[in-house]
Every structure is written in C-alpha cells, then in structure tokens.
UniProtKB/Swiss-Prot annotation:
The keyword Iron does not apply. Interacts with the Sec translocase complex via SecD. Specifically interacts with transmembrane segments of nascent integral membrane proteins during membrane integration. This is Membrane protein insertase YidC. The keyword Magnesium does not apply. Its main location: membrane. It comes from the Bacteria. Residues 29-42 have a biased composition (Low complexity). The gene is yidC. CDD domains: 5TM_YidC_Alb3, EcYidC-like_peri. Residues 28-54 are annotated as: Disordered. Required for the insertion and/or proper folding and/or complex formation of integral membrane proteins into the membrane. Involved in integration of membrane proteins that insert both dependently and independently of the Sec translocase complex, as well as at least some lipoproteins. Aids folding of multispanning membrane proteins. It comes from Citrobacter koseri (strain ATCC BAA-895 / CDC 4225-83 / SGSC4696). It holds the Pfam family YidC_periplas.
Length: 548
C-alpha cells in the first residue's frame, strides 16, 4: 500500500459518501418505531383528533423588535409572517430573510392557542376567537428590553381569554402567556396547543440552494422527548399519513431548514401529546397538545409556552430548552462536529475572520493527527521495502494463491509490518473531513461569512472555482511527490485523473471546506517531506521515485 493507492481509498470513501448523500436526499424515508407512530386514514383526521383549528381571517398586526419582525393574525393569534432583519435574504441584499410566510405560493405558520373541551380554539366550539388589541403595530422602543403584546377575547358566557406575546431585545424566543378568567359556574377544561404547519413543496423563491447535491441539508420536522433527544420526521413521511403520536413530559416540536428553525416548547408540568398531521393541500404539520387544566369558577388560570423563531444559534437554543441546540444538524458525526465548532468559534474570538480560523483549526487538527500520519508513511515505506521479496515469492509460487497468501502473511509477521497500516490512519482521518463538512453546512455563523479577496461567503461554493482548482493542484503535487508501487495500467490511469476528478467534485462544495482541504494538502506536503527525511536516515526511503 502506498500514497497513490491511498488516494484510491479516499476516492472510494468520498464517492460512497456522495452517493449516500444523494440517496438520503431523495429515496430514504425516515424510519419510525411503532411506539411513536401511528398510521392515519384521512388527511385531516390527525389534526381534528387533536382539537387543533385551521387558519382564519382576522386583522393583521405587526410586532417588531431589534431581531424579529412578526405579523400576527388576530383570528386565533397565529404568527403568519416572520422576518429576521439582522439576516439578509441573500449576500449583499437589504431584504431581510423571511422564515414564516403566508402567501398563495407558500404557507409556513406558527399556530397556538387554547383547545380542550372548553378551549376557544377547539373547532367543536365554533370559529376561532377574534382577539381585540389596542394597536395595529407594536415596536420595541429604544431603551426598552421587553415588549408585551396582549390580545383579549370574551366568549358569550363572559369568560375572558387573554393571549400575550412577550418578546425580549436580542432574543428569538417568544413567550406566549395565557390567562383564563372563569366567569361561569362550572370548571373550564383547557389545554394549550402549539402547531407548526408548512407547505411540503418548496417554491423557487424559498430555495436556498441546498438542493445542490453537495450542499444538501435536512428540511422537515423534528421533535425531542426525555427518551429521544432529537428525532427527525420527514415531510414525505407525514405526506404518506404515517403520523407521529407520542406522549412526553417535556420536550419540543420543531420544523427545520438550513440555518433556521421554528419550535414550540410547552412550559407545563404535565404530559404533552406530540403529533404530526397531513392537513391536505400539500401542507404538513407538527405540534403538541398539553393535558387538560381545570380553571374553577371565579378563578383565573395561567398557562404558557415558548416559540423559537429564528437562526439556529446553539448557545441561545440550549438556554431555551434541553437539546434544542441539536437542531443544528451535524449529522451522524455530531460528536466530532460539535467540539470542532466550539474550537473554531474560540479561535474566531481572537482572529475575527472565519476563513483564517478554518486555516488555524486545520493546522491544529493535522498537528494532532501527525502521529497517525507518520505511522501511515512509515508503514507504506516498509511495504515498499518488501516489494522485491513479495515479487520474488510470487514468481516462485506461480498461481498457488493459497501458498502466496500464507507466505506473505508470514513475511509480514517476520518483518513486523501491518499491511493495513497505511490505510488505517487514513480511514481515521475521514470522519474529521466529513465532520467539518457537516459543521460548515449547519453552522449559521458561517452563513455569508467572508474570508478574503473574492470569497465573500464561506458556506457557498467558490463563484470563480479558483479554490477547487488550487485544491486539485495541491493534490497533483502530493501525487507527484509520493513514491508508488502501482504497476497496473488501469490504476495508473485512475491515479493520473484523480486530481481532476476531485477538482470537479469540489466545484460545488462550500468554500470553507475547500479552503480546509487546500491547507490540509499543503500541511501534508510539509509533513511528507519531514517524514521522508526521517525515513531516509533509517534506510526506508529514497528520493528517487521508483515505479517498479
């Protein structure tokens, strides 16, 4: 095994990953256990069973803070629009990113209210409440840290229901507080609910470019319980009426897309029912309904929940609810990606530039991996030294494959050489590369993050393809500087085109990842020369490149 054959291993692992990525994007449904799912027979059945209403017509009011611009419908008090003024829709644009939307082309809403037997949002009790408000516009003023938006409705029996949105400066978590005044003679049985609903099909104006096979990220629903910290639920699964139905004490439900999320976090002490529903017309929903609370005659009951609507900022999300930060989807290598991001963020606190931070973390990672790299090159050098003996043995034994295998293993044992020693360190390094890929694709901090010169967004592909070409050049130099024992003509052709193949693949990769790979290759060249000098002193390497 030598350096150039290792490139074949890299290529195999890389192509396998890309094939898996594309297959996961289009074909692989999210499996669900029998304990947490049930199949429904009608599209509206699940929503109706939960006592959750449809949208209604009312007056639209505007609520603005320094980080949120919400539009709330007084019919039910649903959040129908959400703009994020500190996050532009596109690089260089003054138009804010829109998370929640209610248009003929696309529906994405955060619904909430009071259901249960006596809840005003229960469809069995008539139309949803039409709340009254004092103003049409609520703005967080300078010097003000908290904004309250009270909405009140009184039913025919004289019971008063107040729904108050509480927003704080610099925060994406919105508390929704309920007050129920029972003016009747019988207890009121009330449950809170929170529901997120969204069009399954993504129109062109909502496409962030993540449909690119190399930039694909998860878009769909998710939930968390004390037993299941983070579970995805695909829109396709909901569309097939394979719906979630699980009880949980604590937890949250969410809808996710690249860099941004919405989530409902119930704040009651009892049990909540988490569910998904196919609402028909191409709309999927995930939500919760709390267990009923009794409000006695003459008494006032208080309930609350929290809506997260904004970017996936891990520290802030973790402070809002346990495991909510896991919505920053780092894939199955999250246990590597998370500490890497914390290290990257720490480096950035000193440098102030994410691109230079990636360069520094590359040196750190490659420095930590240096012992494995040295072991890899040493093993390959020993294997090259054995090639004459192996070739002589093959000529002596002819077509006797069994004898060849036995004597070869005996030779490896006698010379204390592990034939897989060159591959194993390489395989160990591959998860680091993939973890960095997930980290760069999932961290909001790298969205629209500039580096230098023409690189204005490390999370996007290089617009001029300069970095991928430089990456291919560094691969070419590594290949030319590496000794080889490859004699098969087909393998030689593959090795010749390997830098070109990788360059083509990396054309669509985020600039930050390509930057990492370029720096990693440069470090490889430096480490390679240092290791070769040590091997020369031990008689295990020669500067003359052999091809036999």
């Amino acid at each position: 095994m030598d350096s150039q054959r290792n490139l074949l291993v890299i290529a195999l692992l890389f192509v396998s990953f890309m094939i898996w990525q594309a297959w996961e994007q289009d074909k692989n449904p999210q499996p669900q256990t029998q304990q947490t799912t049930q199949t429904t027979t009608t599209a509206a059945g699940s929503a109706a069973d939960q006592g959750v209403p449809a949208s209604g017509q009312g007056k639209l009011i505007t609520v603005k803070t320094d980080v949120l611009d919400l539009t709330i419908n007084t019919r039910g008090g649903d959040v129908e629009q959400a703009l994020l003024p500190t996050y532009p829709k596109e690089l260089g644009s003054k138009e804010p990113f829109q998370l929640l939307e209610t248009t003929p082309q696309f529906i994405y809403q955060a619904q909430s209210g009071l259901t249960g037997r006596d809840g005003p949002d229960n469809p069995a009790n008539g139309p949803r409440p039409l709340y009254s408000v004092d103003n049409d516009t609520f703005v967080l003023a300078d010097g003000q840290n908290e904004l309250h938006v009270p909405m009140t409705w009184t039913d025919a029996a004289g019971n008063t229901f107040t729904k108050t949105f509480v927003l704080k400066r610099g925060e994406y978590a919105v508390n929704v507080n309920y007050s129920v005044q029972n003016a009747g003679e019988k207890p009121l049985e009330i449950s809170t609910f929170g529901q997120l609903k969204q069009s399954i099909n993504l129109p062109s104006h909502r496409d962030t470019g993540s449909s690119n096979f190399a930039l694909h990220t998860f878009r769909g629903a998710a939930y968390s319980t004390p037993d299941e910290k983070y579970e995805k639920y695909k829109f396709d699964t909901i569309a097939d009426n394979e719906n979630l139905n699980v009880s949980s004490n604590g937890g949250w439900v969410a809808m996710l897309q690249q860099y941004f999320a919405t989530a409902w976090i119930p704040r009651n002490d009892g049990t909540n029912n988490f569910y998904t529903a196919n609402l028909g017309n191409g709309i999927a929903a995930i939500g919760y309904k709390s267990q009923p609370v009794l409000v006695q005659p003459g008494q006032t009951g208080a309930m609350t929940s929290t809506l997260w609507v904004g970017p996936e900022i891990q520290d802030k999300m973790a402070a809002v609810a346990p495991h909510l930060d896991l919505t920053v989807d780092y894939g199955w290598l999250w246990f590597i990606s998370q500490p890497l991001f914390k290290l990257l963020k720490w480096i950035h606190s000193f440098l102030g530039n994410w691109g230079f931070s990636i360069i520094v973390i590359t040196f750190i990672v490659r420095g930590i991996m240096y012992p494995l790299t040295k072991a890899q090159y040493t093993s390959m050098a020993k294997m090259r030294m054995l090639q004459p003996k192996i070739q002589a043995m093959r000529e002596r034994l002819g077509d006797d494959k069994q004898r060849q295998s036995q004597e070869m293993m005996a030779l490896y044992k006698a010379e204390k050489v592990n034939p897989l020693g060159g591959c194993f360190p390489l395989i160990i390094q591959m998860p680091i590369f993939l973890a960095l890929y997930y980290m760069l694709m999932g961290s909001i901090e790298l969205r629209h993050a500039p580096f230098a010169l023409w690189i204005h967004d490390l999370s996007a592909q290089d617009p001029y393809y300069i970095l991928p070409i430089l990456m291919g050049v560094t691969m070419f130099f590594i290949q030319k500087m590496s000794p080889t024992t490859v004699t098969d003509p087909m393998q030689q052709k593959i090795m010749t085109f390997m830098p070109v193949i990788f360059t083509v693949f990396f054309l669509w990769f985020p600039s930050g990842l390509v930057l990492y790979y370029i720096v990693s290759n440069l470090v490889t060249i430096i480490q390679q020369q240092l290791i070769y000098r040590g091997l020369e002193k031990r008689g295990l390497h020669s500067r003359e490149k052999k091809s036999s």
